[in-house]
């Protein structure tokens, strides 16, 4: 995901002087180096996740669409699915959850044993933090069905294992893992061998078929495998491409935050090894000496809805895992650590150091990001009757007066936009997706600092801002963006590629403009995927531009050829003439020589005196930041979009645009010019 898209929720590191170590404790280093011990730790951690005694009953209620017959049938599950690509899995799920693959109905008791499996427990843990019974039931049902629909079956796993086990002796050895053939460049399988070997419960550098099956059915990896299904799978059969599965496995272990990573990091902080991170352990980890701040961090991490107000906050494994897997934290851990290291201990040490800095920084997602928990709180305010985990139009009408939905027309429009599957109600999954679109991320950002312990206060802010966004933006449906993307996909292969037939002509045969377009929308490469294009053109700035130009005047389901021509003109104008979000990010990265996500004296060894005053000024723009001449990305972005002291009628970015944006044909030239302009101190006098 682009940093520009998540500007308000982006992780920004703050400088913090503390005495805590930047490496994991010695005990954890020993665990990393000893085959099998990591897996033992992971099993121990997951075993601490305690599902409520009535979890199987709540799952049953969530799935039992045809209540009150108290039996979950195949028809119930078919009704439950609105995911088009999961419908094939109904029979597969029933086969997974009970021993009789032909059985087409289940009682609540038949869920009990399966819910104790490691992967199921991990998949369900986040549902504990739902507040109302109806919403918790819906969450349980959705998680268990989604996991059950995607997980590989035993026959597929056996074929996958044999594909990797070259000598067919049912022992996948380190040397065999190291020789795995895959298409990913710069991945040497070392860390794959380390993690798979560590997962072996036999304390040896081989992995048995049983151990392998347990690994590849982890909740966090199964979704990666879904694209490896053949088209036959959608018709009810299972057929997987083993080469694709191999590539996904290599990429997961190399580039993703794995379950073993999460358990190692938890153990690194929970030094008492009692499955409770308490205030003293957090202070030792972060180096924080302020009890008030340390307690506040623990309160934000402690997501249990049942924790009494006067109780001491503690963080269990499920809450820790939920925090690490929140979108922005996950992005940072994977991008800055997992993707940059091919040694497991180096990777864990990197994550350990990064997490320490994240928790210290008051601009970290723990302080600023709308977590899923925030969406749950807001969803439950919207769900006025609190009985079914669904928001109907009547629910919104009930809260209209109290929570500032301005008119009934606003309520109607909100239902049209957020009800993705058009079944006349909004479920949590639809609501969460709607609240994550850039318009809403920006519009509701200021609400996030409201106390999480006062849902009504936070909810009031969210609903009011949501109403404003709904009233003031002309939303464009995803299908419309597909038509715009298709305008550039001249080879009709679901990619925008520089050498595609006819593409250059759409840019008036100007190769420089085409290259800039590809570099911007594709985040650096010269091939643009649909999701990259869609995220780019949904930026808040561009959304305003569409409306200012009267391109979009109502809810749009499909762009016309005339609209696409206007949209293209506006987009190219933005890329060519303005300092874009991508430009700001590239400038920051170019100035950040030591790649520590902050600008300090170390980044300016030859011109510190020229930029010291400017950095001090930038750091002071956001009062919550430490005024120590250390500038993180959020502060830097705020300065770029701040009025110029020399020309108050213009934003700082105007100087960069005048000096660079309109004068250079390539992104590299532009960024080099931005750097030169930044280091010219007279451009931005702060006195």
Curated annotation (Swiss-Prot):
It comes from the Eukaryota. Ca(2+) binds at residues 592, 594, 596, 598, 603. Residues 152-187, 257-292, 406-441, 476-511, 579-614 form the EF-hand domain. The keyword Repeat applies. The keyword Secreted applies. Keywords: Calcium, Metal-binding, Repeat, Secreted, Signal. It is found in: Secreted. Residues 1-19 form the signal peptide. GO terms for cellular component: extracellular region. Its main location: secreted. Binds calcium. During feeding of the phloem sap, protein is injected into sieve tubes of rice plants. This process may suppress the sieve-element clogging and facilitate continuous ingestion from sieve tubes. PANTHER family: CALCYPHOSIN, CALCYPHOSINE LIKE. This is Calcium-binding protein SP84. It comes from Nephotettix cincticeps.
